Amino acid sequence: MRWSLSKPSDKPSGPATPGSSIIRDNGFEEDGRRSVLLTRLQDLVAWGRKNSVWPYNFGLSCCYVEMATSFTSKYDLARFGSEVIRASPRQADLIVISGTVFIKMAPVLQRLYDQMLEPRWVISMGSCANSGGMYDIYSVVQGVDRFLPVDVYVPGCPPRPDAFMQGLNLLQDAIGKEKRPLSWVIGPQGIERPAEESQRDLKRSGRMCATTLRSPDEVQK
């Protein structure tokens, strides 16, 4: 028995002869390539996650204004599947720390992060969130990575919406390359989640090798 997939436009012209089939036989392999997708489960899960990152609606300072601008029609963040702003951390898997993090605000941020869905990601946006910025004082946390695992750092004071969107694209690339996007693996001591490497530690050697530094005017462009 031989068969193939066909469309109405594939029907041969003219009357059908006795004993002939009106379905054109193009070969099983050719039709299978058009309608069958072969992949691995972890690649499919990673592809779905990187294109449906749901950020939590949270802001601290002027950097939040730049992040909110990226949702407007001029920048159209919906192109990357991250336009679904959630009002509850229990429905989000991304939090953007945009602004100055004070000592009194750190426990609140930690609690919001703990309530987020897993796997969850953190983007540190702006100089204040990255390293405290110009506020080198007792009341400001000198970098949100002191108490939260940061996946992407977006520099600037404040960074433009384009910079935030580039950081989001870098995060999507990292999510798509995860070898085990299901997070939990079977280890020698039972089911556990492997520890993720810090992006700051991975890129430290490259930053230390830099010999040419740009001027502040070039950085803002």
Curated annotation (Swiss-Prot):
InterPro entries: NADH_UbQ_OxRdtase-like_20kDa, NADH_UQ_OxRdtase_20Kd_su. Binds 1 [4Fe-4S] cluster. [4Fe-4S] cluster binds at C62, C63, C128, C157. GO terms for molecular function: 4 iron, 4 sulfur cluster binding; iron ion binding; NADH dehydrogenase (ubiquinone) activity; NADH:ubiquinone reductase (non-electrogenic) activity; quinone binding. The keyword Translocase applies. It is an enzyme of class 7 (translocase). It is a peripheral membrane protein. It holds the Pfam family Oxidored_q6. GO terms for cellular component: plasma membrane; respiratory chain complex I. It catalyses: a quinone + NADH + 5 H(+)(in) = a quinol + NAD(+) + 4 H(+)(out). Keywords: 4Fe-4S, Cell inner membrane, Cell membrane, Iron, Iron-sulfur, Membrane, Metal-binding, NAD, Quinone, Translocase, Transport, Ubiquinone. Residues 195-204 have a biased composition (Basic and acidic residues). The keyword Oxidoreductase does not apply. It comes from the Bacteria. It is found in: Cell inner membrane. SUPFAM superfamilies: HydA/Nqo6-like (SSF56770). Its cofactor is [4Fe-4S] cluster. GO terms for biological process: aerobic respiration; electron transport coupled proton transport. Its EC number is 7.1.1.-. Residues 1-25, 195-221 are annotated as: Disordered. Belongs to the complex I 20 kDa subunit family. NDH-1 is composed of 14 different subunits. Subunits NuoB, C, D, E, F, and G constitute the peripheral sector of the complex. HAMAP family: NDH1_NuoB. NDH-1 shuttles electrons from NADH, via FMN and iron-sulfur (Fe-S) centers, to quinones in the respiratory chain. The immediate electron acceptor for the enzyme in this species is believed to be ubiquinone. Couples the redox reaction to proton translocation (for every two electrons transferred, four hydrogen ions are translocated across the cytoplasmic membrane), and thus conserves the redox energy in a proton gradient. This is NADH-quinone oxidoreductase subunit B 1. The lineage of its organism: Bacteria, Pseudomonadati, Pseudomonadota, Betaproteobacteria, Nitrosomonadales.
